Amino acid sequence: MTSMLFYFLSLVTVSPEPVNDAITSTSAMAMKKVDSAAEHLDLMWTIFLFNSLAVITTSVGSGLLPFVQNVSIAELKMRAHHQRYMVFSVKAEQLFQLVSTLIKDSAERLNPGIAILRAQDNSETKSSIWERAKYSKEHFRLLAYVIPYLIPVIALTLNGMLLGSMFSFFIFNGALPFYNLIGPLGIVLGILYSVIYFLAFILPHGIIELPVIIVAGALGYRFASIYSDKIVKDRLLSGDEAESLEKDISYLNSIATEYIRSRYLWTMVGMMLILLLIAAYIETNITPNVALQTADFIDRLLS
């Protein structure tokens, strides 16, 4: 719905051609890697390869990304021994203060756990490790809380935006030609034609592929909720010394490691890969014929 509204507003404020060109060029960019790989692999295997990478990144990557906190603590410790580096790092962090504030305020509205975290005692003692950074203890804990959610949320959002933009493109570009031919009634016929053709173009393989993507996102999101809830409930990363933070991060790493090594996760990944292979076969061998036959059938009805 958001994509359709954005597309409609774009058509109202500018001429249709640049908007359509932008969507088609964006779709072309999204397919560029697939087309390039298809020069060396069969199209079915190319589609399967990139869909598999997306699903594995969304589900497994959510458990890998939190390990970046190890680098953050090591970097803070290094500042104690390198004054010039600390000054440079603090100045660099100042550039991102506005962005971090916007993200923090927006995320709090979406996830109640963030409000609980901010309400906890995030005070800092003198000569604490946080004096070496421009960001506060609260900011660090918020970042640790949000990081596991990034991959599943971004993956599902991008897939939704791409699918919504394609749907909007089909709808409005189907309605306009029919309107030019037979007037206002043509809008209804054009939308109906576009919806049916879009479903024929997506559903044969999408009825398998889309749920797999959603399940991958759900796996990553479920891990993120467990990981982040631990930060809030156990008041982790609330210390002022590197040793205390390293102990908490080691505990969080054990949660992420358990998730990555879990039999349940890899069983689900295996099942998703099998379904993606079936979807890729349908997309390359069945969907084009279904879409073509559907378009011919609608053309005969309208003629």
Name the predicted role of every residue range.
Residues 109-154, 186-196, 201, 248-259:
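Intrinsically disordered, low-complexity acidic Ser/Thr-rich regulatory segments
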Residues 30-58:
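Interfacial helix-start motif at the membrane-water boundary
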Residues 1-4, 47, 51-52, 141-153, ...:
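Alpha-helical transmembrane segments and their helix-start/interface "positive-inside/aromatic belt" motifs
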Residues 281-303:
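Juxtamembrane boundary at the C-terminal end of a transmembrane helix
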Residues 164-278:
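Hydrophobic alpha-helical transmembrane segments and adjacent short intramembrane/lumenal linkers
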Residues 59-123, 142-180, 210, 214:
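Transmembrane alpha-helix/helix-exit interface in multi-pass inner-membrane proteins
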Residues 7-29, 73-80, 290-294:
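Interfacial/capping segments of alpha-helical transmembrane domains
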